[in-house]
Amino acid sequence: MIGGTHSTVNEASNEGMIKLAVQEEINKKVGEVKDIENRKKNVIIYRVPEKNSKSVLERREHDADFVKDLLDGVFNIDIQEGDIEKMYRLGQWTDGNARPMLVGFKQYEHKEQIMSSLWKFRENSIPKFQGVSISHDRHPAERLEIKNMVEDAKKKHLEEEGDDTENYWFRVVGHGSKRKVIKFKKRN
């Protein structure tokens, strides 16, 4: 009888551990989905010159002016007060290093208008914006998935065609399960 009770306690303990592990995994997935949803209205702008000032307020003001000029000058988007929910630099400030800038919009439409008009950067002749690039703000798991997809495509390219990958660009297009890698030849 004592052995049977001990067995029942172990089964209950194992069942409790399994339930706890499942609940932790569900919470992790829910948190990831919420994080992805929160990032949907954000863009990351790279190589924006950073004002060389010790004053945080001066640097923030400079960044806000640059973003407003960029959106107006390149994308013809008139940003009003309150259209940008958040805007800050990513990483630690160091002298002479331009950190990426995260910009979060109040409305998804602003971000979508920017991302669908990225071709305007190539036609842009304003020197102030040369070298600047914009990308989606992605969850770390998404970034890793995209990186792995590109690496796999490069390996497959080398195996099938034997041609060096240096002459090609590999780009991931699509969303979610509909993502695929396309390759195109670099221009000389």
Predicted regions mapped to residue ranges:
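C-terminal folded interaction/catalytic domains of modular proteins
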Residues: I2-N188
